Swiss-Prot record:
Belongs to the class-II aminoacyl-tRNA synthetase family. Type-1 seryl-tRNA synthetase subfamily. This is Serine--tRNA ligase. PROSITE patterns: AA_TRNA_LIGASE_II (PS50862). Keywords: Aminoacyl-tRNA synthetase, ATP-binding, Cytoplasm, Ligase, Nucleotide-binding, Protein biosynthesis. GO terms for biological process: selenocysteine biosynthetic process; seryl-tRNA aminoacylation. Catalyzes the attachment of serine to tRNA(Ser). Is also able to aminoacylate tRNA(Sec) with serine, to form the misacylated tRNA L-seryl-tRNA(Sec), which will be further converted into selenocysteinyl-tRNA(Sec). Consists of two distinct domains, a catalytic core and a N-terminal extension that is involved in tRNA binding. ATP binds at R282, S283, E284, E369, I370, S371, S372.
Length: 452
């Protein structure tokens, strides 16, 4: 959530920065904001006036009572006037509280302001390539045979989309045998790198969170259509009271970042570095017809998430560091990739600046997103009331950052396609071999003998 003081001081500048973002409608109803602000100022000025008058009259009452019977009549009149002022003050306080709630609701739908270093653009075409990497420095590998996509490669290894549809529906899949083992190996490898080499604390979190947690990280109220709501005690989530509604997590960023909700940290405790491997659940409400084949866009997928809670002075340094932590996974796996600086029109709701890592997929002959690393500055912290006690002993909002380290399913896609062989087998990347019993090659003939 934006700092309302910034809007009050320089509304025109805020509007100009917000207009560089992509949206089918205005992010901020400026007329409503100005109307509420005008009423708030009027009520506050009137309140201060009434409080001053009440204080003056209260002193008069004491002086009149000191006169005894001679001042009784006048004292009673002044007391009646004070009682009237009290009633008006209570009415004003109630309305002022309502206005604050209306302003807060208005701000909950406003995205973060782009950092000055973010390129201005309308959509993904405005994103800027920062750097690219490949094992030999010459770009993606050239194959001397016709490449297959991950569906054709993975199906003989145990990738089963038809069974996923049978069990649940479209955009769900089942993995069995070798492919399931490779998927697990990727997740374990990612966790080991993030915890053992990059210093993150591994966490296990609930896969279901409450509405307050979703609001804290910015998924609610604006993106409820993208979430899977859970039933509680036979009650439809939509019918449940707001704070009792439950949702499947779209990313473990939500529970991990909420660790510091309503917490005041000591400055010495910063940075807080957390990671978790969880399933993620997304309705993909706006993705009808896109990536309908394969694992690229699923309702359920696994991801290893990185979250850092940091001192505000360190957040942009940390953004570069976390991007490097995600890159390290791709480099260790030997997967060609590029780093993109997202433009204003392509950034997520809560981000001030975002880097996307895109991995090369030979069958698509293009790069596809596999990680997104974002600095949210104080945007989430303000919603969460996540603070630290600074050197002056005052409570100050932390900055929050999050990133994928990495999306496990898409990493599986990249390994299958980049390490495929002409006979349909897949060479196991050197970094993953300890996690698959030392196997160097996975092929259909090595499929586990499973009675299905």
């Amino acid at each position: 959530m934006l700092d309302i003081t910034t809007l009050r001081k320089d509304l025109d500048s805020v509007i100009a920065r917000l207009e560089t973002r992509k949206s089918p409608q205005a992010f901020l109803n400026v007329d409503t904001f100005r109307t509420l602000e005008a009423e708030r100022k009027t009520i506050q000025m009137r309140t201060e006036e009434l409080q001053g008058k009440r204080n003056t009259l209260s002193k008069q009452i004491g002086q009149l009572k000191a006169k005894g019977a001679a001042g009784q009549a006048e004292s009673d009149a002044v007391m009646a006037e004070v009682a009237g002022l009290k009633a008006e003050l209570e009415t004003s306080a109630t309305r002022l509280e309502q206005i604050q709630l209306e302003l807060q609701a208005l701000l909950l739908g406003v995205p973060n302001l782009p950092h000055e270093s973010v390129p201005v653009g309308a959509d993904e075409h405005g994103n800027v390539v920062v750097r690219s990497w490949s094992p030999d420095g010459k770009g993606p590998k050239a194959f001397d045979f016709e490449v297959k996509d991950h569906v054709d490669i993975g199906t003989p290894l145990g990738l089963d989309f038809e069974l996923g549809v049978k069990l649940t529906g479209a955009r769900f899949t089942v993995m069995k045998g070798l492919i399931a083992r490779l998927h697990r190996a990727l997740a374990q490898f990612m966790l080991d790198v993030q915890t053992q080499e990059h210093g993150y604390t591994e966490c296990y979190t609930p896969y279901i969170v409450n509405a307050q947690s979703m609001r804290g990280t910015g998924q609610l109220p604006k993106f409820e259509a993208d979430l899977f709501a859970a039933k509680k005690g036979g009650q439809e989530a939509e019918a449940a009271p707001d704070n009792s509604a439950l949702y499947l997590i779209p990313t473990s960023e939500v529970p991990l970042t909420n660790f510091v909700r309503d917490v005041v940290l000591a400055e010495a405790e910063l940075p807080v570095k957390l990671t978790a491997h969880t399933p993620c659940f997304r309705s993909e409400a706006g993705s009808a017809g896109r990536d309908t084949r394969g694992l690229i866009r699923q309702h359920q997928f696994d991801k290893v998430e990185m979250v850092q809670i940091v001192h505000p002075d360190k957040s942009y340094e940390t953004l570069e560091q976390m991007t490097g932590h995600a890159e390290a996974i791709l480099q260790k796996l030997g997967l060609p990739y590029r780093v993109m600086s997202l433009c204003t029109g392509d950034m997520g709701f809560g981000a001030s600046k975002t880097y996307d890592l895109e991995v090369w997929l030979p069958a698509q002959n293009t790069y596809r997103e596999i990680s997104s690393v974002s600095n949210c500055e104080a945007f989430q912290a303000r919603r969460l009331q996540a603070r630290f006690k600074n050197a002056q002993g005052k409570n100050e909002l932390v900055h929050t950052l999050n990133g994928s380290g990495l999306a496990v399913g898409r990493a599986l896609v990249a390994v299958l396609e980049n390490y495929q062989n002409a006979d349909g087998s897949v060479t196991v990347p050197q970094a993953l071999r300890p996690y698959v019993g030392g196997q160097k090659v996975l092929g259909a003939t090595a499929m586990n003998d499973m009675d299905m």
